[in-house]
Each structure stands twice: as C-alpha cells, then as structure tokens.
C-alpha cells in the first residue's frame, strides 16, 4: 500500500469531511471553487479510489454516492503499519519515530498502550 496521490488525497480529505455519502458533482463543485479541475478528472479519480477499495459507492438515480470504506485514522494506521513492515529494524524505526513526537503525542501513545494492557501503565 502506498499513500494517496495529490488529487486522491484532496478528494479523500473532502469525502472524510462529509457526514453523508457525496456525489462526484457535489465534490467537483467544492473542489472547483478553489482550483480549475475538470468534472471528468474528479469522476475518474473517485472511480479509481473505488476500484482500489478506498471508496464505497451506491447508485442513486444516474449518479453514485461515495463514502470512505475506512476512516482517516484507519488509513493512517495502515500507513504506519506499512512503514514498520518495510522500514528495516522495527525497534530502530520505532525509536526514530518516538524521537520525533511531541509530549502530547507521547501521552496519547502511553494512554493507548495502557488501554491495550487492560489499564496497566505502559
């Protein structure tokens, strides 16, 4: 798994922001407010994301409504898992990662580890 391309990332960010499934036309309207982009470009990118398994779609009349198949957090976790898998020495990768996080992120990590251990401190 690789990260999203530039337009894929922009589209996924917008889809994640929507509480309800969104059509290509709706998303194109949002995106074209800030940049020149063809409707067909948005449509083909969303179709590609669907074929890759990142978007689910349901037919509504002549159009599809798209929603993410995974949350933004699940996607981020998959990227982190991939980085561990291809990064070489797992302990060193984690060590370098921990050197780069701030106090708030460190506390969040401790909290998650504690919950996973049944409330015992990490």
Task: List where the protein language model places each region.
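Short, cationic-aromatic polyanion-contact patches
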Residues: 3-7, 60-79
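Pre-recognition alpha-helix immediately N-terminal to the DNA-recognition helix
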Residues: 9-14, 26
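Short helix-to-turn junction characteristic of helix-turn-helix DNA-binding domains
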Residues: 15-19
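Short acidic, hydrophobic short linear motifs in intrinsically disordered regions
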Residues: 21-31
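Short, hydrophobic-biased segments on the C-terminal half of alpha helices
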Residues: 43-47
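Glycine-centered, phosphate/nucleic-acid-interacting loop/turn motifs that mediate DNA/RNA or nucleotide
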Residues: 53
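Short beta-strand "wing" residues that participate in macromolecule-binding interfaces
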Residues: 57
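Amphipathic alpha-helical dimerization/coiled-coil segments
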Residues: 78-119
């Amino acid at each position: 798994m690789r990260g999203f391309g530039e337009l894929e990332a922009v589209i996924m960010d917008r889809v994640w922001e929507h509480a309800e499934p969104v059509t290509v036309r709706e998303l194109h309207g949002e995106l074209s407010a800030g940049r020149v982009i063809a409707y067909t470009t948005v449509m083909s990118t969303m179709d590609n994301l669907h074929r890759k398994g990142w978007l689910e779609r349901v037919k509504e009349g002549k159009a599809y409504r798209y929603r993410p198949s995974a949350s933004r957090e699940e996607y981020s976790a998959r990227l982190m898992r991939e980085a561990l898998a291809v990064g070489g020495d797992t302990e060193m990768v984690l060590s370098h990662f921990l050197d780069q996080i701030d106090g708030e992120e460190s506390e969040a990590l401790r909290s998650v580890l504690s919950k996973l251990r049944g409330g015992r401190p990490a």
